[in-house]
Swiss-Prot record:
Localization in the cell: Periplasm
Record GO cellular component, one term: periplasmic space
EC number, UniProt record: 5.1.3.24
Organism listed in the record: Salmonella arizonae (strain ATCC BAA-731 / CDC346-86 / RSK2980)
InterPro entries assigned: Kelch-typ_b-propeller, Kelch_domain_containing_8, NANM, NanM_proteobact
Keyword set, alphabetical order: Carbohydrate metabolism, Isomerase, Kelch repeat, Periplasm, Repeat, Signal
Kelch repeat copies, ranges: 51-95, 97-149, 151-186, 187-232, 235-284, 306-355, 357-386
Main location: periplasm
Subunit structure: Homodimer.
Pfam family, one: NANM
One GO molecular-function entry: racemase and epimerase activity, acting on carbohydrates and derivatives
The protein's name: N-acetylneuraminate epimerase
Length: 386
């Protein structure tokens, strides 16, 4: 039995190696220039005309666009965001306008970080921003969004606004007192996941009516930093944090039909080659190519899941954060490892255009923002990266 297990593991490793990534300039993947500013923890979306918009995060209030249909593709700066610098916003095009939801930032240099519940929209034809007369039902940071149709977007996940804000208020109050600061940090992280009350309500925002609707709840725990993807009427929510420092490998899937979500059976992301367990990912890239759902990059804390299972609630204490370079694909209903990125990256912007997925910016293994734009595509069952 032991020999069979060893042989089985060897075979799985060989299969994974056979699916190794191909770095190509064959024309199946598009080369785009770097963003003018390094970008991590920002946001972005693509309109129906093939124009990508990205901004915020480490770029401050800056926004840029690039037209994929032009022969000479260059980034152009658009009007700066009026709502102040912020990170972890999400954005989507509705009715031809770019909507930006929530995020986390400071009202002033002296103020602590806080979660936002506001909404802004950008009108490309006028190059203007406008604050929408609405607020989200809950504060939105660490949330995710998908476009359901031209007027409606689905938003779910995210941290608990009150718990998150209180942590940064306490950190600010402890300035200059290392002992008190360490106590605040320990008390914040040393709790079970259920005590963080991450959002599990699914909201539908209707841009035409400027209304919010409760579409039910996730079939499991609420998460923050999950990846999301939508193709036709199939929704997928991939991994994320259960609490700060602790990821989940669970993948939620649902069908959107007749203005209703029907949840399907959960699945799990498999371990990467050479590893026994999958910690789960936060800040990963995702998108579809030739019908294959791809997810790559992100970050986790190897060993945190086992610590939590063993009863250590401050599960990532003393563990170095690891940025990932693995790419997984959902092929014929099964998740599998399909290759590696050129470098470990997470917390960038992923945009789908046809069969290509553009990974814009991100955070490298040193925690620094990057300005690169990477293109993913599946071709003849192989992962191509430009």
């Amino acid at each position: 039995m032991g020999m069979q297990m060893k042989n089985s593991k060897k075979m799985m490793t060989l299969m994974a190696l056979c699916l190794s990534v191909a770095i190509t300039t064959s024309g199946y993947a598009t080369t785009l220039p770097d963003i003018p500013e390094p970008l991590k923890n920002g946001t972005g979306a693509i309109d129906n005309n093939g124009v990508i918009y990205v901004g915020l995060g480490s770029a401050g209030t800056s926004w840029y666009k690039i037209d994929l249909k032009k022969q000479h593709k260059d980034w152009e700066r658009i009007k700066s965001f009026p709502g102040g610098a912020r990170e972890q916003s999400v954005s989507v095009f509705l009715n031809g306008e770019l909507y930006v939801f929530g995020g986390v930032g400071k009202e002033s240099n002296e103020a602590p970080l806080q979660v936002y519940s506001d909404v802004y929209k950008y009108t490309p034809a006028k190059n203007t921003w406008q604050k929408v007369n609405t607020i989200s039902p809950v504060g939105l940071t660490g949330h995710t969004v998908v476009k359901l149709n031209e007027t409606m977007a689905l938003i779910t996940g995210g941290v608990n606004e009150h718990i998150f804000d209180k942590y940064f208020i306490d950190i600010a109050a402890a300035a200059g007192d290392d002992s008190e600061k360490n106590r605040v940090i320990y008390n914040y992280f040393n709790k079970p996941s259920k005590d963080y009350f991450f959002n599990k309500i699914v909201f539908i925002y209707n841009a035409k009516e400027n209304t919010w609707e409760n579409a039910g709840e996730l079939p499991g725990a609420g998460t923050a930093g999950s990846s999301s993807a939508m193709e036709n009427n199939s929704l997928t929510l991939i991994n994320g944090e259960l609490k700060p420092g602790l990821r989940t490998d669970v993948i939620y899937r649902a069908i959107w039909d007749n203005d209703k979500l029907t949840w399907l059976k959960n699945s799990q992301l498999p371990p990467s080659p050479g590893e026994q367990h999958q910690e789960g990912l936060a800040g990963a890239f995702s998108g579809y190519s030739q019908g294959v759902l791809l997810v790559g990059g992100g970050a986790n804390f190897p060993g945190a899941k086992q610590n939590y299972t063993d009863g250590k609630f401050y599960a990532h204490e003393g563990i170095n954060k690891k940025w990932r370079d693995e790419v997984y694909g959902l092929i014929n209903g099964h998740w599998q490892y399909v290759g590696k990125m050129k470098q470990p990256l997470g917390y960038g912007v992923s945009v789908n255009y046809g069969d290509e997925i553009f990974l814009i910016g991100g955070e490298n293994a040193k925690g620094k923002p990057v300005s690169s734009v990477i293109s993913f595509a599946m071709h003849d069952g192989k992962l191509l990266i430009e």
